[in-house]
Amino acid sequence: MSNQLIYTGKAKDIYSTEDENVIKSVYKDQATMLNGARKETIKGKGVLNNQISSLIFEKLNASGVATHFIERISDTEQLNKKVTIIPLEVVLRNVTAGSFSKRFGVEEGLDLKTPIVEFYYKNDDLDDPFINDEHVKFLNIANDEQIAYIKDETRRINELLKDWFEQIGLRLIDFKLEFGFDKDGKIILADEFSPDNCRLWDAEGHHMDKDVFRRDLGSLTDVYEVVLEKLQGLK
């Protein structure tokens, strides 16, 4: 049956469609932090995230990255290939910031000579713990070959994203990705890419991402609108 709610998330709801291999993602006007401990309704956020993520995924598709994105069908809705999500948050860091700086006692804003890929176990009850490759295998999340593919694909995506953001005057500090298995068992990029799941700084070091909400730095939608306008100007 189509249009049945499958899953309710922090930032979007997932619905079935007439095609069993396609789902509809509906972006919400909700901002959260600390795994949902703090929630706020922010009018217009869903529209902006849907537009930004759709634009990024269209460019990734065109660049040969296998993703779940099919098309944006309304201001807040998009169609995606149905995947079985791999319970990993894959974080890539180009610059020290956030939890990385706290964990290792280093200042924010230091360029990393080589981007660092980290894994976090997607489990709200455990507060998404930081894990390594051996934990991933122990938990039967992925094997060696799949882990290597996810890391390589994340680094490839990083190079594309860094270039695009540099072109519009933004520095890509870090980001979180999620992957899933499609109907053929192939690992593809899933979820979203928006300022909700990345850090972006402008030339003056101003936050152009969800840290505006986390750190009470101003209007989240004003910042997201600037990011969208810049991305729309990409060649």
From Swiss-Prot:
What EC number(s) does this enzyme carry?
Answer: 6.3.2.6
Q: Quote any Pfam family the record assigns.
A: SAICAR_synt
The alphabetized UniProt keywords are: ATP-binding, Ligase, Nucleotide-binding, Purine biosynthesis
- Its EC top class is ligase
Q: Which GO terms describe its biological process?
A: 'de novo' IMP biosynthetic process; cobalamin biosynthetic process
Q: Which PROSITE patterns match?
A: SAICAR_SYNTHETASE_1, SAICAR_SYNTHETASE_2
What does the record give as its pathway? Purine metabolism; IMP biosynthesis via de novo pathway; 5-amino-1-(5-phospho-D-ribosyl)imidazole-4-carboxamide from 5-amino-1-(5-phospho-D-ribosyl)imidazole-4-carboxylate: step 1/2
Q: Which reaction does it catalyse?
A: 5-amino-1-(5-phospho-D-ribosyl)imidazole-4-carboxylate + L-aspartate + ATP = (2S)-2-[5-amino-1-(5-phospho-beta-D-ribosyl)imidazole-4-carboxamido]succinate + ADP + phosphate + 2 H(+)
Q: Which CDD domains match?
A: SAICAR_synt_PurC
Q: Which domain of life is it from?
A: Bacteria
InterPro entries recorded: SAICAR_synt/ADE2_N, SAICAR_synt_PurC, SAICAR_synth, SAICAR_synthetase, SAICAR_synthetase_CS
MF GO annotations: ATP binding; phosphoribosylaminoimidazolesuccinocarboxamide synthase activity
PANTHER family, per the entry:
MULTIFUNCTIONAL PROTEIN ADE2, SI:DKEY-6E2.2
Family per record: Belongs to the SAICAR synthetase family.
Protein name, UniProt field? Phosphoribosylaminoimidazole-succinocarboxamide synthase
What is the organism of origin for this protein?
Answer: Streptococcus thermophilus (strain ATCC BAA-491 / LMD-9)
